[in-house]
Design a protein with these regions (language model features):
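Short, acidic/small-residue loops that bind anionic groups at enzyme active sites
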Residues: 66-73, 124-145, 324-341
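Internal gly/pro-rich beta-alpha loop/helix module
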Residues: 105-107, 112-204
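N-terminal small/polar loop signature for handling phosphorylated ligands or for N-terminal nucleophile
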Residues: 55-134, 271-283, 291-299
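Small-residue (G/A/S/T)-rich helix-start motifs and N-terminal tracts that mark the onset
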Residues: 1-68, 79, 175-330, 334, ...
Length: 375
């Protein structure tokens, strides 16, 4: 990869050193995750991913474990580093098979293809990956499961199904995007000497956030403050019988730091919401009320509309009013998007910032494109 090349040629860390660090991290991570390495089969290709695999076989052997290698690559295609690691393994007397071994293993380690794979897997390599998947053993992938496109997560003919993927320097995008994510199992990034700063200014690098990052992303609470200091959110959610959608979306607003949350919902939902979320302000409608809605829009710092809103005439009138009169940021989700798909020109009436949050089916309705085209 480019990150490897930068580290080798610009920083000066030799490729074999990176390979050694990778192998050490793979073995250590397997131990931390309680993967049984008592009897391991490492399936190696001809490239540097295969070199990592040969190094893993050596380290496991040095730890007193039984490690065999299935060499699935071609001698003529061996990279310099992979050839070196293979020679070391052979010098140590570790078994290197070229045919499927008739033995049982506690773990199968996939080191056939790395991030550079961009072609469909067929023939011998397909047979190897399919055979690995059939084995009754825990399965670990080196950097990315063989057969997954590192950039898109697409399956290139067939792919290794891992329980654990040990990713060098960072989790590859193909392990986060489906269907690749479902093949990667648990993806764990490990440091091997590639400077994280290398990724900081690259446009092809993506960042993911999890629950642990939430506190870092939200502004700190000031000691001299009150609930009015942290914004007023108007949730226009919940048609009759859809109190749950109104409740869950309001909870989300509180979770990300909203000070005041007002739910504008069908009157049938009032009692349930007052019991479920007594801290929220509940405003209700039985029929469309232009003046009431305009007053609420003036009150809000942020408007969220759509969750459980329904597809009826009242809901449609509410959405039209919001897009015409809202002056603060507006998030449109769920039924709000479905209503919008009937009349996308409504967006042209809105002068406020609008955020749309469609899933694939909603995006298909909005654009008129099939889900396959969008994907």
């Amino acid at each position: 990869s480019e990150a490897d090349a930068h580290t080798i040629h610009e920083i000066g860390i030799p490729s074999l050193v990176l390979m050694e660090r990778a192998a050490l991290q793979i073995v250590e991570t397997m131990h931390k995750k309680n993967i049984s390495t008592e009897k391991s089969l490492i399936v190696c290709g001809s490239g540097n991913n295969g070199g990592d695999g040969f190094a893993v076989a050596r380290l496991l052997t040095e730890q007193g474990k039984h490690a065999d290698v299935l060499f699935a690559g071609k001698e003529a295609s061996l990279s310099e580093e992979c050839r070196c690691q293979k020679q070391i393994v052979e010098n140590m007397g570790i078994s290197v098979f070229t045919e499927f071994p008739d033995e049982e293993y506690t773990v199968i380690i996939d080191a056939v293809f790395g991030v550079g794979l961009c072609r469909e897997i067929t023939g011998h390599y397909k047979d190897v990956i399919d055979w690995m998947n059939l084995q009754d053993a825990e399965k670990v992938a080196v950097d990315i499961p063989s057969g997954i496109c590192a950039a898109t997560g697409k399956i290139l003919g067939t792919a290794f199904r891992a329980d654990l993927t040990v990713c060098m320097a960072c989790v590859k995008l193909g392990c986060e995007l489906f269907p690749g994510k479902s093949y990667a199992g648990e993806s764990i990034p490990v440091a091997i000497g590639i400077d994280p700063k290398y990724f900081s200014n690259r446009l092809d690098v993506c960042y993911t956030f999890d629950k642990n990052d939430l506190g870092k992303l939200l502004p700190s609470r000031m000691m001299n403050s009150h609930k009015g200091s942290y914004g007023k959110v108007l949730m226009i959610t919940g048609s009759p019988g859809m109190a749950g959608a109104a409740f869950l979306s309001a909870c989300a607003a509180y979770t990300v730091g909203a000070g005041l949350v007002q739910i504008y919902t069908a009157s049938e939902n009032r009692l349930a919401l007052q019991e479920l979320l007594p801290e929220a302000i509940i405003s209700c409608y039985d029929s469309y009320d232009d003046s009431q809605l305009s007053h609420l829009l003036d009150w809000a710092d942020v408007v969220c509309i759509g969750c459980g809103l329904g597809m009826g005439q009242i809901s449609e009138k509410i959405l039209k009013n919001v897009l015409k009169n809202v002056s603060c940021p507006c998030v449109i989700d769920a039924d709000g998007l479905n209503l919008l798909s009937r009349n996308i020109e409504l967006l042209n009436q809105c002068c406020a910032p609008v955020i749309l949050t469609p899933h694939m089916k909603e995006m298909s309705r909005l654009t008129g494109w099939s889900i396959d085209t969008i994907c």
